[in-house]
Amino acid sequence: AKAGFDAWDFSMFDMCKYDWSAGCFLPNDNPLASDNYLAFARRLKQIGLDNGILCNQSHAPFPSRGPIIPYLKRALECTAEAGGKICIIHPDNYLSAQENAEMYFDLLPFAKECGVKIATENMWGWDTEKDQSSFAACATSASFNEHLDVVNDDFFVACLDIGHAEMRGSGEGAANMIRALGNRLQALHIHDNDCWHDSHQIPFSMSIDFDAVVKALKDINYSGYFTLEASSYLEAFTPETTQKGLCDLAASAKRLSDMFEAL
């Protein structure tokens, strides 16, 4: 809040820790893994409100398969308790739209009980021979819209990861995908990269054309938040200087918002 943000994104990646090679969960002292996970979510909400910011959206743990699935409902619960309206739940990278829809169909009744929309996201794989990203679920406009069409529910929307959309090999370009998604696009993950790797860097620091991105958002009358997913930028800061990094990130989001309003 002191950095200048007006909302916070509830990331729940550490809600569960699973050793895929051993086939078992790992010890986890994260409050979201405890029996008091809802109380923790309520506490975060109150801290935000006490400082003048609200939870706008969240991110469930991933990958969305097997033993992780039960935690996706917990993520929806926590989103509701924190005050968030959208929970991003990854599709399985390598399943079809029809196969991924089965998971979303299972989750949607509970999401509606919670009053939280589910957003799917554009993913990517990696082609080691070509040394570039490769197709994964929702990576193209056609795949993304197919996922949305199969589920066909007002509580199932799109979160476009701007960086993923710009990665060489899989992405179609963020501006193209924004226009293809239209009013189904209700959430964003914004970060910068070299249009090759998934860098999750601060906007305006690398190669993405944010003028084109913002123009496309304006063209579809986007009405959601400009939510950053640029935590890699903070890795260069120490605990003592992290506030400066947060201020930089907030300033980049404000710049995007100002660009949008100026059009």
Where are these regions (language model features)?
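Histidine/acidic residue-rich metal-binding segments in metalloenzymes
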Residues: 103-111, 149
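Histidine-acidic metal/acid-base catalytic patches
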Residues: 1-7, 13-16, 25-26, 42, ...
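Surface-exposed cleft-lining segments at the edges of enzyme active sites
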Residues: 88-97, 123-136, 164-166, 198-201
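Short, structured loop/turn "capping" segments at alpha-beta junctions
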Residues: 114-120, 154-159
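A conditional alpha-helix N-cap/helix-loop micro-motif detector
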Residues: 37, 68-69, 97-100, 137-140, ...
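Structural motif corresponding to the early beta-alpha repeats
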Residues: 3-102, 112-117, 218, 223, ...
